[in-house]
Design a protein with these regions (language model features):
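Proteins enriched for Cys/Gly/acidic motifs involved in redox and nucleic-acid/cofactor modification
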Residues: 4-195
């Protein structure tokens, strides 16, 4: 058996207190935008989520543990294991409900599910603002910043930013660790063996 936990359902990452963000906000002056990241899948997705949070922190976002407190809602999905795909869709739908109750909130779907099925997801999940492939985790804050400020829900279509799958990151890339104590995951490969 593996020493890593089985990721059969999504795991919510709650790290708001760990961030010390540092760029400009599209909200009222003096108010930092807030991001909530929910991770579904394997330890590789955990690493990608940590890198996303580091990228958001570098763009002056606060990472928050509660979806209700966020302006940007991100689901980092799994697209390979059946149960994790179902959990990914469940997480997307849960955060879509949160988005409906908030003015100008954004919903972003990234990870393997988005990489593999972005066209189908964009058709079936119009409440999602942005689909990002698995190779662009650290660019998500930039992509969110390019979305229209106040989109007309009746006219907008989801934006797809899906390119080359998978990326191994430079060790100096900003990262917010979700590990407990002195442990963390190290991503040494890209892809999925579907063995979990």
């Amino acid at each position: 058996g593996s020493q890593f936990p089985a990721f059969s359902t999504w795991t919510e990452v709650r790290l708001g207190e760990l961030m010390s963000p540092t760029s400009k906000s599209s909200l009222a002056p003096g108010i930092k935008p807030r991001v909530h990241v929910r991770t579904v899948g394997c330890p590789k997705n955990v690493v990608d989520s940590e890198l996303m949070m580091g990228a958001f922190g570098a763009k002056d976002y606060d990472v928050v543990g509660e979806a209700d407190d966020a302006d940007v809602l991100v689901v980092n999905t799994c697209g390979f294991i059946g149960m994790a795909r179902e959990a990914s869709v469940q997480a997307i739908l849960e955060l879509a409900k949160v988005k409906e109750e908030k003015e100008n909130a954004r919903l972003v779907v990234t990870g393997c599910l988005s990489q593999r099925f972005s066209d189908e997801l964009a058709t079936s999940l119009p409440e999602v603002d942005l689909f990002v492939g698995s190779g662009s985790a650290t660019q998500i804050p930039e992509f969110v910043g390019e979305l229209p400020e106040e989109p007309d829900p009746a006219l907008r279509e989801p934006v797809l930013r899906v390119g080359k799958a998978g990326t191994l990151y430079d060790p100096d890339t900003p990262r917010t660790s979700t590990g407990v104590g002195y442990s963390t995951y190290v991503k040494v490969a890209e892809g999925c063996s579907q063995k979990c």
